[in-house]
Amino acid sequence: MIRTYGLTHIALAVRDPERSLEFYRAVFGVTEYYRDADTIQVQGPGPHDVLAFEKMPDIAGNAGGIIHFGFRLTRPQDIQAAMETVERAGGVVTSHGEFAPGVPYAYVRDPDGYEIEIWYE
């Protein structure tokens, strides 16, 4: 086993890094911390949550075997507001419900088509 600090980032091929920044900022409150000509990196709500939006329009949205990635809510009652925020920001809610009583979830897609699970544990 190798010792690591954990998963450090996820890089997504996107059509428009600026549009991805706007979506993830509106929905998840990410903050930009690095930018170059074709990439924007953002810090998520967790101390080590990093997403990189890399301009690669030819393969944008092609998850290559990755089914989804997730964000965990701090309160279960926020699931409805989360779904509404996704739709206002240009995303799509694909399904929602409860894994168990009081354990809500929603699967959504960002503007490039990546599936995101929003849930409470």
Predicted regions located by residue number:
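Core segments of cupin and vicinal oxygen chelate
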Residues: 5, 11-54
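Short beta-strand micro-motifs in enzyme catalytic cores
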Residues: 40, 49, 67, 102-106
